[in-house]
A protein has these predicted regions:
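Glycine-rich beta-strand-turn "strand-cap" elements at beta-sheet edges
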Residues: 19-30, 67-74, 103-138
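An amphipathic, aromatic/His-enriched active-site/gating alpha helix that lines ligand/cofactor pockets
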Residues: 24, 55-65, 83-118
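Short hydrophobic/aromatic beta-strand micro-patches
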Residues: 36, 81-83
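Short, glycine- and small/hydrophobic-rich beta-strand elements in well-ordered beta-sheets
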Residues: 20, 54-79
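Hydrophobic alpha-helical segments, especially transmembrane helices
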Residues: 3-4, 32, 94, 104
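N-terminal targeting signals for Sec/Tat export/insertion, comprising classic cleavable signal peptides
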Residues: 27-58
């Protein structure tokens, strides 16, 4: 029982810090785009996805991450992890020339699209993940 109480007391500051970090990051938009592309346009789509992701992160301060990925079991299944500093950053992003080029250029390529908004479960880990390779832009 004594060990359990010590464990609970140890966790209290960690939970408190996590709750405080959640308040800070509550304005962030985190989304996974689930995309299926037509096989005959796969190569073309991959170029569009790479370009819009790289340009967005490089040129838009409110874009924290646009990370396109392909399923190993089905090349035509694409997932894009999108993280924006705020709703305003997302709204700015979708109005940019590079996003509009992507959207218009892939209209005939995308078979299905589902934008899945996500809730962060460990927002305090986000800086650690992104600082592993590069500083977090918020």
């Amino acid at each position: 029982m004594k060990k359990f109480l010590l464990f609970v007391l140890f966790l209290c500051p960690i939970v408190s810090m996590a709750q405080e970090q959640t308040k800070i990051d509550s304005t962030m938009i985190v989304r996974i785009s689930e995309i299926e592309v037509y096989p005959e346009y796969l190569k073309e789509y991959l170029e569009f996805a790479h370009n819009v992701g790289a340009t967005s992160v490089k040129e838009e301060p409110g874009v924290i991450c646009i990370y396109p990925m392909q399923q190993l079991r089905n090349d035509c299944q694409i997932r894009i992890l999108e993280i924006y500093a705020s709703l305003e950053a997302y709204q700015h992003h979708i109005k940019t020339e590079h996003f509009q080029t992507y959207k218009q250029g892939t209209f005939h390529i995308v078979k299905s699209l589902d934008l899945v908004d996500m809730r962060q479960m460990a927002p305090e880990c986000l800086p650690l993940i992104f600082n592993y390779c590069c500083p977090l832009k918020v």
